[in-house]
Regions:
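PLP-dependent aminotransferase-like
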Residues: 67, 71-147, 151-163, 167-172, ...
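Conserved active-site segment immediately N-terminal to the catalytic lysine
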Residues: 170-207, 238-243
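Conserved PLP-binding active-site segment in aminotransferase class I/II-type PLP enzymes
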Residues: 1-68, 72, 140, 144, ...
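Buried hydrophobic packing segments
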Residues: 61-66, 87, 91, 213, ...
Length: 389
């Protein structure tokens, strides 16, 4: 890369072009074709699950997960407020449910202490589930996002979900490649430990199919239902009979070809992400009060994919938006972290708890360039520009 340094872009090469050409020359370019099934099998093997259901986006994957899990109108779902809004809408408003927003801890992931506090002190546990004392609604599920590829505290969150009779939905849309390497969950990949998990192949993710996603579940019937819903709920394909409302959430054969090529390169992408993260951290941590926010590492029993890098400005005296503008002037694309979802136009009346850290990180984070084809020289240019702010 030279000149403009983008935030996060696809890394395609000859392999992706060759694989996609196979689909094009065969004529199987749409949602039918053998490569979709082949990609599903490869994904399932990579994350260590018996089955993966391909979809056309991470958002649709989460919608399928919510429906397969039985979340319905009138339910409530505990969700993080510091995340992309597509992590919340499909689990709540798409299916008629309402969110309960919870802030983050220093991993940027949902705070287990705050989740526990809400369940213990704002709800009543009954034989058939957990009920919100304020609204009387059943709190049916807990949505967990592995933010920027950093593993959430799954042992704690799984325990909370079990004790309070909550379905646990993992949003691993940013965390493909992240897994536990030690401890009680050793070998488990992000997205595979809850009741159902979802992933994304958007263009800015660690690997991409242009757009796409997939669903895995520890309940075989949930995965089967997700597949059924994604294909317009066809009960009889020949006679065009449908047994419920379904959706066109299918992945195309061309996308699956891109995915197969990218999956073969994924471990190399993870290595590059770690190398550039280490380069940023060694050069910028502590300079002028700046910090590169940490990921859980091997010493914590986790192999992180280091998807997005966060420069933390609080102790530097620098203004977030000024930093973004000055770097943009030098041809370096950065961005702020997401606006909190409980402050978005559609959610001002929903309950929200333990927001202080999320508000702080919203104000002081700048995400730095992190493409898997970001070179050491590109990274040095970003570092020099940051040091000269």
């Amino acid at each position: 890369m030279s000149g403009f340094i983008p935030l996060s872009v696809p890394n395609f090469g000859e392999k992706e072009a060759a694989y996609a050409a196979e689909a094009i020359t065969s004529g199987w370019v749409s949602t039918s074709g053998a490569k979709v099934s082949e990609f599903e099998e490869a994904l399932a093997a990579y994350v260590g699950m018996p089955r993966a259901v391909a979809a056309n986006s991470g958002t649709s994957s989460l919608h399928l997960a919510a429906m397969a899990a039985g979340i319905r109108r009138g339910d409530e779902v505990i969700v993080p407020t510091l995340t992309f809004i597509a992590a919340v809408n499909p689990l709540t408003r798409y299916v008629g449910a309402e969110p309960i927003f919870i802030g983050c801890n220093d991993t940027l992931c949902i705070d287990p202490d705050a989740v526990e506090n809400f369940c213990a002190n704002h709800c009543t546990l009954k034989e058939d589930g957990l009920y919100n004392n304020k609204t009387g609604a059943r709190v049916r599920a807990l949505g967990v996002v592995h933010v920027f590829g950093n593993m959430a505290d799954m042992p704690r969150l799984l325990d909370i979900a079990r004790r309070y009779k909550l379905i646990l939905i993992e949003d691993a849309t940013e965390a493909l490649g992240t897994r536990y390497t030690a401890g009680p969950l050793a070998g488990k990949a992000a997205g595979t430990m809850g009741d159902i998990g979802c992933y994304s192949f958007n263009g800015n993710k660690i690997m991409t199919t242009g757009a796409g996603g997939f669903v895995v579940s520890n309940h075989a019937d949930w995965a089967e239902h997700a597949k059924h819903l994604s294909t317009q709920a066809k009960a009889d394909m020949l006679q065009f009979l449908h047994d419920e409302i379904g959706y066109n959430y299918r992945m195309t054969n061309v996308q699956a070809c891109l995915g197969l090529a990218q999956l073969e390169r994924l471990e190399g992408f993870v290595e590059t992400k770690k190398a550039r993260y280490d380069q940023y951290k060694a050069a910028l941590d502590g300079v002028h009060g700046l910090r590169i926010l940490p990921f859980k590492e091997e010493s914590d029993g986790v192999r992180s994919n280091h998807w997005f890098y966060s420069l933390y400005l609080k102790d530097s005296g620098l203004d977030r938006d000024t930093v973004i503008a000055k770097l943009q002037e030098q041809g370096i694309q950065t961005r702020p972290v997401w606006a909190l979802i409980n402050e978005q136009a559609d959610y001002p009346k929903n309950e929200a708890y333990a927001l202080e850290k999320a508000q702080d990180y919203r104000k002081y984070i700048v995400n730095l360039p992190c493409s898997t084809n970001l070179t050491e020289q590109d990274c040095e240019r970003v570092i020099a520009a940051v040091k000269n702010l």
